[in-house]
């Protein structure tokens, strides 16, 4: 039986005979004495094979990634050979017995190779997961889950599982559909979230629910998205939005303190959605970056520069300035690169003014657009933005969405650039934030109707219920997102608990009574049986762990992730299925070229 994990061998074991299991990380032959670095999930230990011992012959056969059992005596390392990088670095194990549990073919890569392509890593994921960094990532993920459970258990939350095979309902992204063999022509959907089931649990009287569960969305993938992801899903009854936020702010603070010994600020700052968009162009602003928008829409209405004037007078458009302290030193090539960058977000260009000498007014400014801006506009621009000599001011002028997306992304890019770091434009602190009071609806110009900004079960703010029928664009929601360093790590809301209000929301979304009854009849019925006031939140476990570990991709904190093409390179899923299986499911493929 194993005495302890290999990486846990230390001075406390001196003079003891221990049995260890693990993999050969490295083998070294030093003039007749063989050294093995034995590895397991806890770390490394040095194993020494003396040529006078019978185990030496077996040691000569050992190669990297052989799985072995070792029994030996723990002794101090010779003076001058201690390794402070290892927990076991002061000791070594003099092997008495060794057993090869399984040999290994030559691995396709060295585990300490940091330049592997992601394709190679995901194809050989079993070996990739042996790497110490990946083991640390997944162990940290486990610890986060444990601390979440501890915290919620102490507050009386109950872990209740909800179905994985459920009804397809519109929640913004495409569902993964599962055909029913028994009910021909009918399909289950894999849940995008347990949203409706957790609301049913509140109606059922389970007033505090949580679940760490898989969710599924068939959407285009980015670095921070997976088709299947893990959600910390929570719901509670009889609490208002302030009380709900307090519980889960405390939970995140607890997790960071216990897992990483990080003290997050208390309380988290709070900002309305409107303010966040006005100041940062984003509903998940990265507060590590000190740069902010200055809105100059009103200033630019009567200038001769048509790009600014048109945006300043068009409904739904805006003109903003982004002052970058010390940015006048940016080169033309750097500015061109930023111009190309904002083009990704739909911006048609990137106007700028370098403030060489603020005291000289127009004469101290450098830009092709200065001649098209009158003195009053320039003076107000400098006053509002607080521009000083040596600064640069970038501009966004277009439809509000394009300006917010483009200049908001530029703000973050400059802040975290080498220039931004040298200029002190971004901190390395943890910067949490609550963003509250979101619009209930977004208008889809293509379809000519409103869609739910979060989901259609979010309660309107007090006094906004009448807007559901008179003017949905004015309705704001009791919705809230927890943002950390520019990532939305959790989102939630107070839910609608009255059937008549839920029906009004469906009508605002152009979901007719018949469609609402067909898709959500069970919800509408449940709300009529004394449904309590309730609300909740869901956190992205994958995102939280990605941030804690500093991983470059969310795929580095998931054991067996999918690629950006939603494929598992290890198992080659998704795969074809044979005709018999399709017939049993009453499915026929049409116009599909199998690759």
UniProtKB/Swiss-Prot annotation:
Compartment(s) of residence: Cytoplasm
Coiled coil: none
Binding site residues for L-aspartate: 171, 217, 454, 495
Top-level EC class as recorded in UniProt: ligase
Function: Aspartyl-tRNA synthetase with relaxed tRNA specificity since it is able to aspartylate not only its cognate tRNA(Asp) but also tRNA(Asn). Reaction proceeds in two steps: L-aspartate is first activated by ATP to form Asp-AMP and then transferred to the acceptor end of tRNA(Asp/Asn).
Family: Belongs to the class-II aminoacyl-tRNA synthetase family. Type 1 subfamily.
Protein name: Aspartate--tRNA(Asp/Asn) ligase
Gene name tied to this protein: aspS
């Amino acid at each position: 039986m194993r005495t302890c994990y290999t990486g846990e061998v230390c001075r406390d074991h001196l003079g003891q005979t221990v049995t260890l299991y693990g993999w050969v990380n490295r083998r070294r032959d030093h003039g007749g004495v063989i050294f093995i670095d034995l590895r397991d999930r806890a770390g490394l230990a040095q194993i020494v094979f003396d040529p006078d011992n019978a185990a030496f012959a077996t040691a000569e056969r050992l190669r990297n990634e052989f799985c072995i059992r070792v029994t030996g005596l723990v002794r101090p390392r010779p003076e001058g050979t201690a390794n402070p990088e290892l927990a076991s670095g002061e000791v070594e194990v003099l092997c008495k017995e060794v057993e090869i549990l399984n040999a290994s073919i030559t691995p396709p890569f060295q585990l300490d190779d940091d330049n592997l392509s992601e394709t190679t890593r995901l194809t050989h994921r079993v070996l990739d997961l042996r790497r110490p960094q990946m083991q640390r990532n997944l162990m940290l993920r486990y610890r986060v889950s444990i601390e979440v459970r501890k915290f919620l258990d102490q507050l009386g939350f109950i872990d209740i599982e909800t179905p994985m095979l459920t009804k397809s309902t519109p929640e913004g992204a495409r569902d993964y559909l599962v055909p029913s063999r028994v009910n021909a022509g009918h399909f289950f959907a894999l849940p995008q979230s347990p949203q409706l089931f957790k609301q049913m649990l509140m109606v059922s009287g389970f007033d505090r629910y949580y679940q760490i569960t898989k969710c599924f969305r068939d959407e285009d993938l980015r670095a921070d998205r997976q088709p299947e992801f893990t959600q910390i899903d929570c719901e509670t009854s009889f609490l208002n939005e302030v009380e709900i936020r307090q519980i889960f702010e405390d939970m995140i603070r607890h997790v960071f303190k216990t897992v990483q010994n990080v003290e997050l600020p208390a309380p988290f700052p709070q900002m309305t959605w409107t303010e966040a968009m006005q100041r940062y162009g984003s509903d998940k602003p990265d507060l590590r970056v000190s740069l902010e928008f200055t809105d100059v829409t009103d200033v630019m209405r009567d200038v001769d520069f048509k790009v600014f004037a048109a945006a300043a007078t068009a409904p739904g458009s805006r003109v903003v300035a982004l002052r970058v302290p010390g940015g006048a030193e940016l080169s033309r090539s750097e500015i061109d690169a930023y111009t190309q960058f904002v083009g990704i977000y739909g911006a048609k260009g990137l106007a700028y003014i370098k403030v060489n000498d603020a005291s000289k007014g127009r004469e101290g400014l450098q830009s092709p657009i200065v001649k098209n801006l009158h003195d009053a506009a320039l003076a107000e621009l400098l006053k509002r933005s607080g521009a000083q000599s040596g600064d640069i001011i970038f501009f966004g002028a277009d439809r509000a969405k394009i300006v917010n997306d483009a200049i908001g992304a530029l703000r973050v890019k400059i802040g975290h650039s080498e220039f931004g770091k040298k200029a002190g434009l971004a901190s390395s602190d943890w910067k949490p934030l609550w963003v509250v009071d979101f619009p209930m609806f977004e208008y889809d110009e293509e379809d000519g109707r409103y869609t739910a900004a979060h989901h259609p079960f979010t309660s309107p703010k007090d006094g906004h219920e009448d807007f559901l029928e008179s003017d949905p664009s004015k309705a704001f929601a009791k919705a809230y997102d927890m943002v950390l360093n520019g990532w939305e790590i959790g989102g939630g809301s107070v839910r609608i608990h009255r059937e008549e209000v839920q029906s009004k929301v469906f009508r605002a979304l152009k979901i007719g009574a018949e469609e609402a009854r067909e898709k959500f009849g069970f919800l509408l019925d449940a709300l009529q049986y004394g449904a309590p006031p309730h609300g909740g939140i869901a956190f992205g476990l994958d995102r939280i762990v990605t941030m804690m570990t500093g991983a470059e991709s969310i795929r580095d904190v998931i054991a067996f992730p999918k690629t950006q093409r939603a494929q598992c390179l290890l198992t080659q899923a998704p795969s074809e299925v044979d005709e018999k299986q399709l017939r049993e499911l009453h499915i026929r493929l049409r116009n599909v070229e199998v690759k």
